Amino acid sequence: MSDVTIASESERKFERRKWFEIVREVKINLIVMFSNPDFITREHFEITSIEEAKNLMFEFSLNSEVSKEEEHNSENLYHKPHKMCRDEFVLFRKQPLPQPSGTDYFSKISDEIILCIFQWLPKTSLVRCSRVCKRWRDLSYDESLWKRYDYGRKKIEPCVLEILLHRGVSILRLAMSELKSPVFSEEFLQGPQWYSSLQYLDLSMITISPENLAILLSVCIHLKKLSVENCELNDDCCRNISQNRQLTVLNMAMCTGITPEGLHAICVNCEKLVEWNLSWTNLTTECIEACFPFMPTTVERLNLSGHRETLDDYGLIEALQRCPNMIELDISDCALLSQHSFEVLVKFCPNLEHLHSSRSYHIPAECNRLLKQMKNFKYLEVFRTLTDKSLASLREYMPDVQINQHVFSTIARPTTGVRRTSIWGLRTRDPSV
């Protein structure tokens, strides 16, 4: 081997040793690329000095560290990766928010004035106002703006009612709505006991299971007027109803699932009950025996229509003896009642003003003349019980009494007449502007 060949190999080994030292200094695994004897890679980067090689190695080390960090962050889906770059490049820049021009007049007026403005807005506009700023959010959620709400004929999504009750609604109409399960979230049910501000609640013909209805009624202890017409009940529902000690009006017309225990709890605890509608509830003899002897003495308007085979003279007399202040009574479609019930009615209820006895065929027509003894008696409904001749004779005998003027009973019903969006005379919808 010639001396020239030996010299070139020694120079190549010497230069290769320098490259190993450079790579070792920057701690990067690029030995293979820079130990190539033909130096193609070096010529591509136009490396002419060791100083330039060090700078190039430093750039490769940064890229390697960035790739390792991105690989590590990709394992965590909740970690937002950030990119490293040179000082002369900017990948992300936060745009400054445009500053509003002009005068903010709302900052110069008090919260009370803003609330007076907000009270004329519908609920959908209030929700939009709550997204403007923190101050508007607090004001738009004020309880004075959410006293009444009409959710009738709507499909209510799960847990929406929980949000609505927390805003302080006291007058709520849910008639003919569909309330989807669950009514309340798990966090709410497992948290500390909380009670709503509801005082007037209309649940007539609502689509809901008895279990969910019991959960809804469990947070209501301040109710004054309640309607659960045409709902399926259970013992838990009745017990939750009975915890409303200030309840004065209760509409249970056409309800199913009523038990003697549930009725007894309502009679014992709701001592301020004034109007009670139990029509067409298919009360059994056990229910009547558990309820009527304990009927609240404050009841003035009572609807017992539709009990064709269970309500007899004995049961009605027990109820009448407990309610001396009876003003309106509906005993229509009670086929077992006789003249004896009528005589007790005239004796124990001297303040009676309105009587419904339609289709009670076992009550003789002559018993209606006994009602003339009552000084305050004004209205009598006897549809399909008297002939035209008997009806004309009765009108001549009692000229001051209006006969067959009211087709339907309004006892404890939340919505009557043309006021279809009001419950018990209270407005539920937003004012029109």
Q: What feature does the model see in each segment?
A:
Residues 134, 144, 167, 193-196, ...:
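Inter-repeat linker/turn residues at the boundaries of leucine-rich repeats
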Residues 224-312, 316-319:
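Solenoidal tandem-repeat scaffolds enriched in leucines and small polar residues
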